[in-house]
């Protein structure tokens, strides 16, 4: 499949190794719970998990190629300094820059992003996503 990398250059990427296994835990427990939620709506779609961001070492939690939707799940380390994850405040700030690069890459490739924080998993529903993001899943 053709994508633009983070620099805007077109590249080919084989998506087959990243096709979602709905029953396998990859990543955090929260990520698995989000995956199980989307399974009921997306089981017949082309979905990749832990998909590489071309031109970087970053990955996207989920990409629905059928609907052009990316889903990112975030733990508390995403918006709060956690010494175990970040080691220092500089690394914490760098994580924001990486997120910006990732979201720019997703936009460059025509994907809409859904961000779900740990404390929002309990609220997950088709209606909640429509209300919060304006997206039909």
Positions of predicted regions on the chain:
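Nucleic-acid endo/exonuclease domains
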Residues: 1-137
């Amino acid at each position: 499949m053709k994508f633009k990398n983070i620099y805007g250059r077109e590249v080919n990427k084989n998506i087959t190794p990243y096709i979602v296994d709905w029953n396998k835990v990859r990543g955090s427990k929260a990520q698995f719970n989000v995956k199980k939620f989307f399974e009921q709506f997306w089981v017949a779609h082309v979905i990749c998990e832990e998909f590489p961001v071309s031109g970087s070492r970053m990955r996207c939690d989920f990409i629905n190629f059928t609907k052009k939707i990316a889903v990112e799940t975030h733990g508390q380390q995403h918006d709060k300094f956690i010494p175990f994850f970040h080691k220092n405040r500089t690394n914490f700030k760098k994580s924001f820059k990486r997120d910006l690069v990732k979201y720019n890459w997703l936009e460059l490739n025509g994907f809409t992003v859904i961000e779900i924080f740990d404390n929002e998993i309990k609220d997950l529903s088709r209606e909640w996503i429509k209300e919060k993001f304006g997206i039909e899943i």
